[in-house]
């Protein structure tokens, strides 16, 4: 059953609760890139399944739980562009996302930062998909880590960050 929600601006949306409820096509990076690129060009987004292994995702969440969640100091945040302590909700999720994982203090967060750099930022599947879409080698401009939903209002990412030529930058969301 689809979940009926209102966006922060009051728009009604139906959100699938499971993947079987979602009719959005998913593409395989190893044998369906042409269709994926066509879908991206037509719709402005594309979903790929399994670019990163479940094991890598589990290791990343484990490092997050061991290194970031218990940290009592301040970290630079995406929402406010300020250094802040972790803000937890009733589910013990950090609600103020981290901005620029690649800039985390290596003395405090080296294992988390290095893992993200190696297994996500340098992931060959992600890099190949982005190179296919962009027709050039991808470059990281900004990274974020969200654990809890901060109720961002509906937007296009170019409202916040884009290239000199509007629309020539893309974002990758990993879930």
Which role fits each region the language model picked out?
Residues 2-42, 49-156, 160-163:
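Non-heme Fe(II)-dependent double-stranded beta-helix
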């Amino acid at each position: 059953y689809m979940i009926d929600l209102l966006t922060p601006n009051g728009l009604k949306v139906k959100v699938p609760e499971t993947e079987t409820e979602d009719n959005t096509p998913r593409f395989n990076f190893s044998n369906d890139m042409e269709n994926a690129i066509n879908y991206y060009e037509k719709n402005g987004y594309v979903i790929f399944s399994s670019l990163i292994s479940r094991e890598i995702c589990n290791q990343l969440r484990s490092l997050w739980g061991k290194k970031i969640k218990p940290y009592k100091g301040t970290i630079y945040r995406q929402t406010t562009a300020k250094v802040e302590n972790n803000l937890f909700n009733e589910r013990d999720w950090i609600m103020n996302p981290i901005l620029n994982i690649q800039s985390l203090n290596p003395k405090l967060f080296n294992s988390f930062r290095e893992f993200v750099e190696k297994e996500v930022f340098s992931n060959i599947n992600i890099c190949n998909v982005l190179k296919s879409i962009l027709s050039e080698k991808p470059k990281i401009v900004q990274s974020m880590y969200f654990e809890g939903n901060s109720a961002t209002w509906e937007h296009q990412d170019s409202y916040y960050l884009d290239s000199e030529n509007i629309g020539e930058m893309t974002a990758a969301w990993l879930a």
